[in-house]
Amino acid sequence: MRLAGVNLPLNKHAVIALTYVYGIGNTSAKNILAKAGVAPDKKISELSDEEAHAIREIIGNEYTVEGEARAEQQLSIKRLMDIGCYRGLRHRRSLPVRGQRTRTNARTRKGKRKTVAGKKKAGKK
């Protein structure tokens, strides 16, 4: 079954398969299936056309998914950077945004180490 441009695995339970779509997590998947009246443990291959259509309708009307959700996230980060707030500054400098330490660690956000020339560790006296 194809949903929002993503091929859902047919052998998985519906609640798990829906999380393959960007913007739908575990809780959202459970809510979608409850509204559509589909059992969460039903496999995607076992869904009827009416159930699949109901799921598509709910996601199309009530959720922002895939490219739309990614674009929305990028716009909110760009807005933070444009207004010049602290969080925007941290995004602009590619540093951790949520208050983590940066003296050590933070390598995921900062990227590969850049060696600083002329900096030596002080020896013992």
Swiss-Prot record:
The keyword Ribosomal protein applies. The keyword Thylakoid does not apply. Keywords: Ribonucleoprotein, Ribosomal protein, RNA-binding, rRNA-binding, tRNA-binding. Gene3D superfamilies: 1.10.8.50, 30s ribosomal protein s13, domain 2. One of its GO terms (cellular component) is cytosol. PROSITE patterns: RIBOSOMAL_S13_1, RIBOSOMAL_S13_2. SUPFAM superfamilies: S13-like H2TH domain. GO terms for biological process: translation. One of its GO terms (molecular function) is rRNA binding. Residues 93-125 are annotated as: Disordered. Part of the 30S ribosomal subunit. Forms a loose heterodimer with protein S19. Forms two bridges to the 50S subunit in the 70S ribosome. Located at the top of the head of the 30S subunit, it contacts several helices of the 16S rRNA. In the 70S ribosome it contacts the 23S rRNA (bridge B1a) and protein L5 of the 50S subunit (bridge B1b), connecting the 2 subunits; these bridges are implicated in subunit movement. Contacts the tRNAs in the A and P-sites. Belongs to the universal ribosomal protein uS13 family. PANTHER family: 30S RIBOSOMAL PROTEIN S13/40S RIBOSOMAL PROTEIN S18, SMALL RIBOSOMAL SUBUNIT PROTEIN US13M. This is Small ribosomal subunit protein uS13.
